[in-house]
Amino acid sequence: MKKKYDIKTTDVETLKKWYHLMTLGRALDEKAPSYLLQSLGWSYHAPYAGHDGIQLAIGQVFTLGEDFLFPYYRDMLTVLSAGMTPEEIILNGISKATDPGSGGRHMSNHFAKPEWHIENISSATGTH
């Protein structure tokens, strides 16, 4: 009998990378509200919990130099998975001049890195 499906497995190094990204993203997601409570930045925070798997996948299939990414305010793990650093995400959150997306002018959670074609969008996403 011929097999109907051929299931490929994921190598251990890739699984470790995904685990690292997911735990790092969750740590950032959980830390952001403390900046807000201390009035250190993060004008607001919308956690992405429950969207982890799809956000990781979207970031992993993003091809630098070919694709455009238009993340909305809950897409922290998407941009982390696409290659933005935790430092860049925090700089956005606390509105510092060295934020790569806006030089500290965008609201927090409006992730961007224009040279990578990761573009900022409006808060009114029209997705809900």
Question: Where is each model-derived feature located?
Answer:
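Charged, compositionally biased N-terminal leader segments and the immediate start
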Residues: 1-15
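Cofactor-binding active-site loop characterized by glycine-rich and histidine/acidic residues
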Residues: 30-128
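Conserved N-terminal diphosphate/IPP-binding helix and adjacent helical/loop segment
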Residues: 5, 9, 25-33
